[in-house]
Amino acid sequence: MTIDNPSAFLKTLPTGSGVYQMQDAQGKVIYVGKARNLQKRVSSYFRRQLDSKTQAMMAQVQSIQTTITRNENEALLLEASFIKQFRPRYNVLLRDDKSYPYLYLATHQKFPRLDFYRGAKKAPGRYFGPYPNAGSVRENLALIQKLFKLRQCSESFFKNRTRPCLQYQIKRCTAPCVGYVNEQEYRRQVEDAILFFEGKNDQVIIKLTERMEVASENLVFEEAAHYRDQIRQLRRLQKQQIITGGKGNIDIIGIAESNGAIGFAILFIRSGRMIGHKPFFPNTPLGTTLQTALVEFIPQYYLSPLRNGDIPERIVTSEPLEDRLWIQRALSSGLNRKLAITDQKRAPYKQWQAMAALNAAQALSQHLAQKNTFALKLEAIQKSLALPNPIARIECFDISHTLGEATVASCVVFGEEGPIKKDYRRFNISGVTPGDDYGALRQALTRRYVRLKEGEGILPDVLLIDGGMGQLRQAAEVLEELQVSGVILTAIAKGPGRKAGLEKLFVWGRREEIHLPADNIAFHLIQQIRDEAHRFAITAHCNRRAKRRVESTLQEIEGIGPKRRQKLLKYFGGLQELQRASIEEIARVPGVSETLAKAIYDDCHQHKG
C-alpha cells in the first residue's frame, strides 16, 4: 500500500503480529521487519526523531506491505524467509552459501563406515556435527581413525576386497573387509568411537583399561600394549582440548564492530568439547547497531536450510539480545526439546563470551585489512592499465584440455574482497574441433554472457582472458554479437620462455602491449586471478578426463560387455584397484579366463595415467 497520507495509512494497519515489507519507487523490497504489533511498529518509522540510517531508508520508501501472522513465532520465521527471498539492502544479510559438514557413521551397516558428509541428512545412521568447516571434519576423522580404526571405504570397495588396503598397513583400520576382525570386535570399536563423540572420554578410558588388564592377565602383551597406547592418546588429548565443564552442545556467538562494519564469530562446543570456530561478515547497512545486527543474524543463521535444522541445546551471545525470549520460542517451535538462549555474562559462560568476542574482533580486523588490500590492488589495476572507470568486479576465462581431449573452460570471479567462489563457473565444451582453443573460448563466453544478459548474474567491469591478442579478438567478437557493452576486455599472455614475471598484457582497442614491472601490485593481482582460473580449469579438466577414461576402459575388449565390466569394477572396488591387480588376481574373478584376464590387464595399463 502506498503511503501518500501516512496518518490515514497507519490507521488501517492491524494491531496483531506480522511482517512488513518496505518498497521503493520501483517496487523493490528494501527492508523487511517483524512486529508483535504491526500498527505500533510501523508507526515508529514516521516519528520526527529517527537515526541517520532509518532516515535514509525512509526517504526511499514509497509503499509498505504487511502480512498478518497467527503468532509472534510465525512472524519471526516469515521474516527470515522474506529476507532470504528478497535480500533487502537495509537488512543485515548473511552470506553463507555452503551447507555444513558432518562426520557420518553408517550404524545400520554390519561393519559401519565413518566418513565426511555434507548435505541433507537422509541416510540412516548417526551424524556428528555440524563442524565449522571441512578442515575440522577431516582433522577429527583422522583422529578417530587413529584412535578407533574405523573403516572409511565405500560399500563396493569394502565388499570386493581380497586383501587389506593401505589403511590397514598404516594402522588406521582393522581390515574387517577380509575378516581380520569379527563383527563383535568391530562393534566394540564403533561403540568406543560413539562415546568419544559424545564427550564421554572417561568411560572410554575405563573400558580400555579393563581390556588392557584382561589382555595382560592372558599374556597377550601385544594387545595390552595397543590398549595402553590408546589410553595414552586419549589422556594426552584430554589435556590439549578445551573443556567447557558441561556435556551439551553449545554455540557461543561473539560480535564486534569496526569502522561501520560488523563481524561475528561462532565457537562450536559439541559434547563439552570445542571443535572449532567460524567467522561471518554479513552485509550490514551503515549505522546498524550491534543489537540490531545480532537480532537479524541469529534467525537467518539458524533457520537456513543449509543447517539441516541443527540447533544446539544452548546459544550464548557476547552482547545483550533484544527479543531474546521471542527468538528462543520461535527457534524452539520446530524442535522436540528445549532451547535456551543466554546473553548474561556470568559463569560458566563469561570467559567463552569474551573469547568469542575476541575472535570476532580479530577476524573482522583481518577481513577489513584483506578487503582494503584488494580494493587498493583493483585501484592499482585501473591506474596501471589506464582504465577509465574504477573496478569492482573482474572475470577471468581459461581453457584446459589434453591434446583436445575433455576440453573445459573456467570462469573465476574476483571482487573488492577477493575471490567470489559462489560465482565461479565451469563449462564442458562440446561440438568444437579438438584442440580449437578459439572455438572453445567462443562457446564458453557465449554461454556465460547470454546468461548474464538474461539477468542470471552481474556483468563484470573487466573481462580478463588467459591468452594473447587472438583470444582477445574472439572475446570482443562474442560481446559485440551479444551487444554487451561497458566491459573492458584484457588479456594476459605468456612471455619469452614462459617465465613468470615476463607476461604481456593487452587491452582491446589499443595496439601496444603493456609490460608491468615484476614487483607491481596490479601485476601480482592479475597473475593471481589468471592462476586461479588456470587451477579451476585444470581441476575440472582432470575430473572430466578421468571420468571419460573410466567409462572407456575395457570397452574395446572382446568378451567384455557392460555387465561384465561392472562386475569387474565391483569385484575390485573401482578402476584404480583393478589397475593395481595382477593377471592372476583378475583371473580369480568368476567367469574370467586367464586369456581374458591378460587382455584386461593390458587394457588397464594402456589407459592408466
Swiss-Prot record:
GO terms for molecular function: DNA binding; excinuclease ABC activity. SMART domains: GIYc, HhH1. It comes from the Bacteria. Disulfide bonds: none annotated. It is found in: Cytoplasm. GO terms for biological process: nucleotide-excision repair; SOS response. Residues 202-237 form the UVR domain. InterPro entries: GIY-YIG_endonuc, GIY-YIG_endonuc_sf, GIY-YIG_UvrC_Cho, Hlx-hairpin-Hlx_DNA-bd_motif, RuvA_2-like, UVR_dom, UVR_dom_sf, UvrABC_protein_C. Residues 15-92 form the GIY-YIG domain. Transmembrane segments: none annotated. Keywords: Cytoplasm, DNA damage, DNA excision, DNA repair, Excision nuclease, SOS response. Its main location: cytoplasm. Interacts with UvrB in an incision complex. The UvrABC repair system catalyzes the recognition and processing of DNA lesions. UvrC both incises the 5' and 3' sides of the lesion. The N-terminal half is responsible for the 3' incision and the C-terminal half is responsible for the 5' incision. PANTHER family: UVRABC SYSTEM PROTEIN C (PTHR30562:SF1), UVRC/OXIDOREDUCTASE (PTHR30562). HAMAP family: UvrC. Belongs to the UvrC family. This is UvrABC system protein C. It comes from Coxiella burnetii (strain CbuG_Q212) (Coxiella burnetii (strain Q212)). The lineage of its organism: Bacteria, Pseudomonadati, Pseudomonadota, Gammaproteobacteria, Legionellales.
